[in-house]
Amino acid sequence: MIDLVEEARLGAAGAAPPRAPRVSVLMANHNGSAFIADALASIQRQTLRDLEVIVVDDGSRDDSVAIVRRLAALDPRIRLLERDRSAGPGAARNAALAVARGDWVAVVDSDDLIHPERLKTLLTKAQADGADIAVDDLLIFSEDETAPPRALLSRMLGGAPRWIDLPAFVRSNRLFGREPVLGFTKPLIRREALRLAAVAYDEALPVGEDYDLLARAMARGLRLRAYPDLTYFYRKHRVSISHRLDEARLEAMAANAARYRAEVEVSPTLDAALSVRERSITAARGFVRIVADLKRGAILKALRTGLRSPTSAALLTIVVGDRLTALARGPATPRRTSAAGRVVVLSRQRVIGSTNGSSTYLLSLCRALKARGLSLEFLGPSPGTFGRWPWMRLTPEMAVFDRVRVRGGWRVGDLLIAQDPAVLGSALLTGLERLLAKLKLKSSGWVKPAPYAVSAAAADVDRLYVAERARGAGAIVADYAFLTPLAPYALTPGAPCFVVMHDLFSSRTASFAAVGATDSVATLDPEREFELLSQADAVVAIQETEAAAVSAANPNQKVIVAPLAATPVAAASPGEGPLLLFVGSNTAPNVVGLRWFFDQVWPTVRAAQPEAVLTVAGNVSRAFATVPPGVRMLGPVPDLDPLYARAAVVVSPLTTGSGLKIKVIEALGRGKAMVATSVSLQGVEELLRSCVLRADDPDLFAAHVVGLLASADRRVAQGEAALDRVRRSFSPEACYGEFVEAIAGDAS
């Protein structure tokens, strides 16, 4: 008997039924208390919000029903159906199908996980392609971590979607075959097509019920499309049944195969495929008998079975191969899930030290976590991080990480060396380009820039790298919104993800368009950016304005404001003579802002102060072949302290961009007088009103600079005001306290 236990949430009797959802997720459960909460949580986190979850409990005797009830009380999308006695997974799924209301139905097992973007991605692609059935690739992982995670379909699909016809589908389900078993996949099916085909699960099957349903549906004309997206996480553990075979299960599969032949129209190609699968079932039955006899010590009986069925005996090589593989792999890696305080930082940045604003901010956050006693690991899942650098030298600042690993790199002391020789070739070409440009023999620009690694699309090998190395983290820190889709591949549902957003990328497009420029990094539309951010448990925003934008778009998401902390010097200094300083990396906001300063501000400053000198530090210098008189381009500088000490005035003339301008806070911490635009002060303008001179008009900007150059006393007074503000508002405790406590509580 089935009892529905969600009437109270659906309303009183006679109330209008709720609108049908896009997707009904069907979940059969039998004694699944160990994993069902995580499975349901992964469904609740879907970016496709318009769904229902139908859990059919198949006579469980553990507390899994209580777990589902508790979650259903908090989320009306979850419905629970209960069976007094176990009737098997097919019967449970038929019960769920009978009450499903979605346009599509998706199967998720109670011990598995799905990626937050899975349902939206599959549904969008299936509808665009006209598929009735959509399946994705499976990431297969072992609960005890004795085998590395792997993808099921990657070799079959080769990274591209593929239509699967019925004979190919049947043939792939040969037992102990070399081809991936498509019957293991968990389908998304158009419900109306399934209804018209009059297909249901075979309730006599203890395993292989998804294969049978899809084979029957395809025999009645439904079209199956397989996609390479690695978004279903299939868990292997000691009590799961889907990968275990015994005599009774194989007998049920043989009987099902016979019924299938009798009920569908069998073409010659389908007949051949069915025969391959049927022979594999027969061989597997003999193999199971041989293994059982060997375990009982009935050697002669096992030998006779092997002689009668050489194919069955040949399957013993699989067991031997598995044992040899296990021996070659060595003892199982100790489980890491018990390691308290382990924080894994996922990043595609080229982080080697405080060489640019985003690296400075990330390392500052990490130092605060380290001071709290947490263990930090830097994990770079993509070799694209190297760009055109054949090696990266890690500065002493990287000691904040207990371990630094980048895929495609060798660690040798403080060096990370790219394994791909093409990177060295690119570096040599780039060096040649710069030399020829400097000698005026050839203009620059003929060497194609390396892609912006931070926003690059992840490959399956990146995902598997995270799955193997981030497993068991207490918390995940995603460096930029682009990294949040990688966090679930840590396969640790209890580990919260904190995304360090750095910038609100979707605001940058309009900002650059307003000044007739193009961003040097990635562009994101607001919908996609907020969707990426929503996949994290908490967003770490660098300033209030962007935090407010996230809260407005994702009202149920935790947002932590954590501006860059600064360590103030003891006292302000006036600097030396008419010396100005600008510090910046080679990014579009710095390039555009500096050009504006050169064209609109610098001539006025030089007219009033002919001895004025502007020192530019950082690789922004690479963007300028020529500079105005009085400008010195230093390039990257290992130690900025002497430059700040000598500078009379620090300028930040940015006219576009987002985030908190890291160099503004750094300069204030050095006790320097500063002139900045409103873009440079975005998010902290009111806070810094008393200690930074603001100007968006070029003449006013120049007047502020000239006035400060003329008065050492004014510079010192403004520098002291800056130090006072830093001490009160930008100490590590003030900036990072909430973030550190949130992540420390979750990671411990």
Short names for language-model regions:
Residues I2-A248:
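Nucleotide-sugar donor-binding/catalytic module of glycosyltransferases
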Residues Y361, A552, V561-A645:
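Conserved catalytic-core segment of nucleotide-activated headgroup transferases in glycan assembly
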Residues G357, D713-I743:
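A charged, aromatic-enriched C-terminal amphipathic alpha-helix characteristic of glycosyltransferases
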Residues T231, A645-G659, R670-K672:
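Acidic donor-binding loop of glycosyltransferase active sites
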Residues I2-P17, F176, A219, L224-T337, ...:
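C-terminal subregions of glycosyltransferases and related glycan-biosynthesis enzymes
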Residues K663-E666, A673-T677:
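Short hydrophobic beta-strand element within catalytic cores of glycosyltransferases
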Residues I417-P485, A514-Q535:
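Conserved nucleotide-sugar donor-binding subdomain of glycosyltransferases
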Residues F498-V499, S506, F530, S534-A570:
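Donor nucleotide-sugar binding/catalytic pocket of nucleotide-sugar-dependent glycosyltransferases
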